[in-house]
Design a protein with these regions (language model features):
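Sec-dependent N-terminal signal peptides
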Residues: 4-15
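Aromatic-residue-lined binding/catalytic grooves and analogous aromatic/hydrophobic interfacial grooves
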Residues: 21-435, 467, 471-476, 526-530
Length: 530
C-alpha cells in the first residue's frame, strides 16, 4: 500500500511540474515590422524584440521613465547585426520566447543570439554564439536626438492630452560617446507639468507637501561590450520617424561575444546618477545573475497555471503571454499601465495617420485611469501573484499625503480624495480637470461630464489589499492608514454636503447618503452608487 501511495504521489508531483511549464512561443519567419514583435523583460524592464531584414531589433522600456510632460518614454531602439549574417536566407530561422526561463532567443543552424533581463538588477544582456568567426554591430537608435515639437494629436502620450500649450516640446536626450561604451539619458528640468497642474488647481499654498516624482528625474543607461568599439553615427528613418544611430562594432571577429545595457533611474544630479550606474555595472555577475533570474521565472510559473485544449487552449495561451508581460514589471516602483504596459510600438502600424514616435500611446504615460487599472490587478489574486500587486498598492500609499492635503485645501475636512484620471503625483489630469472652468465651480471637482464625483475607484484597490490578506495571510498593516483615510473621505464629505442641503447629515435610518455620486464614468448624479 505504501508503494502504491508513493507511486501516485510521484505521478502527481511530476504532473504538476510538467503542467506548470508553459510551452515556448516559436516563430519560424522574420517580422515585417515592430508590430510583429515578441515581449521580453524582467524586474521593471520590457522589450519588444523582432527580426527585420536579418537585423535583430528591440525597443527598450523601463517603468518610471516619465519626462517633463509626463510621457512614459522608451529608452531607445537597439539594432544588432551579425556579419556574416546567420539569419539571412536560411530555412532554419527560429525566434523563441522561452517562457519558463523568461528570455528570447534568435537562432539558425549556425548561430544563437540570446536576449535576457536580470530580474533583480536593471541590466539587459545580449549574448551571441556562432559556428564561424563573426563580427557584431550594435546600434543605439534615438528619435530624441533633438527637441521634438509635440504635434496635434500627439498630446495623448502626455498629461496635456488635447490641451497642448503652444510650443510644447519633448526635450532631447543627452549622450556621452566613449571608445568602448555609450551613455544616454533624459533629465527633466526643475519645472515640469507638475508645477503647471499645481498652479492650475490652486494648490500652491501646500505645494511643498505634495509628492513630485518628476523634478530632476534622470533615466537612461549605458551600452558596453568587451569586444565593442565606437564606429560613428548615421541617420535613418523608421515607421515615419527620423532617428540618429550611434554605432559600435566588434574589434575583431569571434565565435562568442556579448553586449549589455545597464539602466538607472533616480531624482538626482548627473554625477550622482552616473555613480549609481557605475555601481550597478560593478555588481554584475553574469553566471550568478542568470541563474537567479531563471530560477525566479521557474518559480513564477509554478505558482499557478491553467490547462485547456482547442479554443480554450488558444485563450489560455493568450492569458499565459499576458501574465508573462505582467511578470516583466514585477518589481517596479510603478504599476503596469493598462494602456500597453512596457510593450507599445510605433503607432502608425495601428493607424497610418499617426506617424508619431515610438513613445506615443493613448491615455497618457503618467496618468492613472483607475477604472482600467483595476482590471489589470484583480486577476492577480487568483493567479497568486501577490508580489506583483505591491506596486499598485504602493502607488496609492505614496500619494496619501497629497490626497489628504487636497481634501483639506478644498473642503477643510479629513480624508483622502483620489480622483479618476489621476496623475502619478496625485492630482487630477489637467486636461480632464479643465483649463476653462467657471469661476464659481468647486475647485475640488473635475469640470468634466464623465469624471465629476467619480472618486470611489480607490475603494476597489482598498478591497484588493484586504483580499491579499485573506488569500495569502499577508501583513497589510502598512496600508491601514490608506484604507481608513479613503473611507473617512466619504463619511466626512457627504455629511458636509448633506448639511449644506438640510439639517440632517444622515438619512432617516441613520445611514450615510452618497449623493451626488458616479457609477464609473457613465451614470452621473447617482444616489448611493455601488
Amino acid at each position: 500500500m505504501k508503494n502504491i501511495f508513493t507511486f501516485l504521489l510521484l505521478v502527481f508531483i511530476g504532473g504538476q511540474f510538467l503542467w506548470g511549464q508553459p510551452a515556448n512561443l516559436v516563430w519560424n519567419t522574420q517580422s515585417r515590422n515592430a508590430s510583429e514583435s515578441m515581449p521580453c523583460g524582467g524586474g521593471d524592464i520590457g522589450m519588444n524584440v523582432w527580426v527585420e531584414n536579418d537585423d535583430v531589433l528591440f525597443y527598450l522600456s523601463r517603468s518610471g521613465s516619465f519626462d517633463e510632460n509626463n510621457c512614459l518614454l522608451k529608452q531607445g531602439r537597439f539594432r544588432v547585426r551579425l556579419t556574416p549574417n546567420p539569419f539571412a536566407g536560411t530555412a532554419s530561422f527560429r525566434q523563441t520566447l522561452h517562457l519558463n526561463d523568461g528570455y528570447v532567443s534568435v537562432s539558425s543552424d549556425n548561430a544563437t543570439l540570446i536576449i535576457w533581463v536580470d530580474v533583480f538588477h536593471p541590466v539587459v544582456h545580449v549574448e551571441v554564439k556562432t559556428k564561424e568567426l563573426t563580427s557584431m554591430r550594435v546600434n543605439f537608435e534615438s528619435w530624441r536626438y533633438e527637441d521634438r515639437p509635440v504635434r496635434k494629436g500627439e498630446g495623448q502620450q502626455c498629461s496635456y492630452k488635447w490641451a497642448i500649450p503652444d510650443g510644447l516640446m519633448t526635450r532631447r536626450d543627452s549622450v556621452c560617446v566613449e571608445e568602448d561604451n555609450f551613455t544616454f539619458f533624459h533629465r527633466n528640468p526643475e519645472r515640469t507639468i507638475f508645477d503647471v497642474v499645481v498652479d492650475q488647481q490652486g494648490m500652491n499654498e501646500v505645494k511643498e507637501q505634495l509628492y513630485n516624482p518628476l523634478k530632476n528625474l534622470i533615466f537612461g543607461g549605458r551600452l558596453s561590450g568587451d569586444n565593442l568599439v565606437y564606429n560613428g553615427t548615421r541617420r535613418g528613418h523608421y515607421a515615419g520617424t527620423e532617428y540618429l544611430a550611434w554605432m559600435y562594432k566588434s574589434k575583431k571577429p569571434t565565435y562568442k561575444q556579448s553586449a549589455r545595457i545597464v539602466l538607472n533611474t533616480e531624482q538626482s544630479t548627473v554625477p550622482a546618477w552616473e555613480a549609481s550606474l557605475a555601481r550597478t555595472e560593478k555588481e554584475i555577475n553574469v553566471s550568478k545573475d542568470k541563474q537567479a533570474t531563471r530560477r525566479w521565472w521557474n518559480d513564477f510559473w509554478k505558482r499557478s497555471f491553467i490547462e485547456g485544449e482547442g479554443e480554450a487552449g488558444d485563450a489560455i495561451r493568450n492569458y499565459t503571454l499576458f501574465r508573462y508581460m505582467l511578470g516583466c514589471n514585477a518589481y517596479s516602483q510603478w504599476p503596469t499601465k493598462f494602456n500597453g504596459g512596457l510593450f507599445t510600438f510605433d503607432p502608425m502600424y495601428v493607424d497610418q495617420k499617426m506617424e508619431f514616435t515610438p513613445d506615443f500611446r493613448k491615455w497618457g504615460g503618467g496618468t492613472m485611469t483607475a477604472q482600467n487599472q483595476r482590471l489589470v490587478y484583480w486577476p492577480m489574486l487568483k493567479s497568486g501573484d501577490f508580489d506583483l500587486m505591491k506596486s499598485q498598492f504602493d502607488f496609492y500609499l505614496r500619494l496619501l499625503p497629497t490626497a489628504e492635503a487636497r481634501t483639506r485645501a478644498y473642503w477643510g475636512h479629513a480624508g483622502a480624495c483620489f480622483t479618476e484620471q489621476m496623475e502619478n503625483f496625485g492630482l487630477p489630469n489637467p486636461a480632464e480637470y479643465g483649463f476653462k472652468r467657471p469661476a464659481s465651480f468647486d475647485k475640488g471637482l473635475e469640470y468634466n461630464a464623465w469624471l465629476e464625483y467619480e472618486w470611489d475607484t480607490v475603494l476597489e484597490f482598498c478591497q484588493m489589499i484586504l483580499e491579499t490578506a485573506r488569500y495569502d495571510s499577508l501583513d497589510i498593516s502598512c496600508y491601514t492608514p490608506l484604507i481608513e483615510s479613503s473611507l473617512s473621505f466619504f463619511d466626512e464629505h457627504y455629511r458636509q454636503l448633506a448639511l449644506q442641503r438640510g439639517r440632517k447629515d444622515l438619512d432617516g435610518s441613520g445611514k450615510l447618503v452618497i449623493y451626488p455620486g458616479s457609477a464609473c464614468e457613465t451614470y452621473k448624479m447617482a444616489y448611493n452608487p455601488s
